[in-house]
Amino acid sequence: MRLGITLWGFALGYREAVDLARPTEDAGFHNLFMVESVLSNDGVTTAAMIAARTSRLLIGTNIANVYLRHPVMLAAAAVAIDEIAPERLVLGLGPNNRAMITQAGFTWRDPREVLQVTTATLRAVFAGQGVAGLRQPRSASHVIPIHWAGMALETCAAAGAHADGLMLYINTPARYGRAVERFRRAATEAGRDPGRLPVSLLIPTFIHDDLPTARQAAREFLVHYARWPHYAKTFAASGHAAAMERVAAAYGAGDLATAMAALDDALLDEVVLLGSPSRIREGIERFARAGVEWITLGPQAVATDSLARQAERMIAVLAPR
């Protein structure tokens, strides 16, 4: 099983993120990816800086937002990173959500259509095609895999037909299995070899020896996802419908504390990793037994520990070697 790290780029400084790169590589982790939030941070530029600091580590975005950049400029950035770090870039793409995109002033379009158009444009530029009448962009010297973020099962299926890999996030083991099945079935139907298309699972991680403290941090983090319909629907379909109903009612009443309390321990233990290092290692093994082949851990702030401090602890106590 491959074990990597993904950093929430908007929750730590650019220098902090880049300074974590070499320790991550030296500890034997498989990858270091960057989360990008809408108009909050630049995950692609951060990945480029990490590329210049490392020599073996797989680097990339988890994800770069497809609404924020012209796809030709995204392709140019990817080619630049690949020249600095040959065959080490994974370009993860995703849409975030309608509310954030429209609030930022962008037009929301069908996300699967945007993913397909962006992917086709990226591949054209990588192959040396440019825009008529403009200077030719640099082509890619190596294959640059394009992975899609998938929340809806329909997006997972579309990724199987069009992308080079799938990036999943806060999935229960059962939901992970359904998503991967749809992804691989669609790949097979499209005449592709699903065995050559990797699937990663990003798992928010909260390291603390005091279990209640870790659980509280996880609830504070997860409650904001549970209020979004697409995440609530996924959690409900994974056996947590009653909890999602309680969260919705509490949010409707403006009661954040009750909404957090509605996220029971069973849900937390299915979608995040929390507690002592030994407990988290047991959780990693549990996901591996469920068929997860590539886990990327997402350190989060816990109590007085910042995200950067949690990442440092993660590198020290959860290193693959």
Regions found by a protein language model. Give the residues of each.
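Active-site-adjacent structural elements that line small-molecule/cofactor binding pockets in enzymes
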Residues: 1-321
